[in-house]
Amino acid sequence: MSNTISEKIVLMRKSEYLSRQQLADLTGVPYGTLSYYESGRSTPPTDVMMNILQTPQFTKYTLWFMTNQIAPEFGQIAPALAHFGQNETTSPHSGQKTG
């Protein structure tokens, strides 16, 4: 199942542990505008999405964002939260210790 553009923006932001304000500051997209994009009230134009995806933290999600495909061998991955469903905000393993 494919996520909407707004869901993908939220997944990328949360996977990078960024607040909406931090993403706005990082990309230059005004906070209110970003809020509209994330809520699905408005769709970001291509130039805005290009700007977001060219930000160093997000280039690794470009293939996934555009095609729903990944290529880990080329550094193209999906956000971690995408693997657990669009309504989840934590991994089922988030409470476990590693090592």
UniProtKB/Swiss-Prot annotation:
What Gene3D superfamilies does the record point to? lambda repressor-like DNA-binding domains (1.10.260.40)
> Where is the organism placed in the taxonomic lineage, from the top?
Viruses, Duplodnaviria, Heunggongvirae, Uroviricota, Caudoviricetes
Establish whether keyword Transcription regulation is in the entry.
Answer: yes
Report the PROSITE patterns cross-referenced here. HTH_CROC1 (PS50943)
Q: Name one GO molecular function term.
A: DNA binding
**Ranges where the HTH cro/C1-type domain occurs:** 9-63
Q: Which organism is it from?
A: Escherichia phage P2 (Bacteriophage P2)
Q: Under which name does UniProt file this protein?
A: Repressor protein C
- Tell me the superkingdom of the source: Viruses
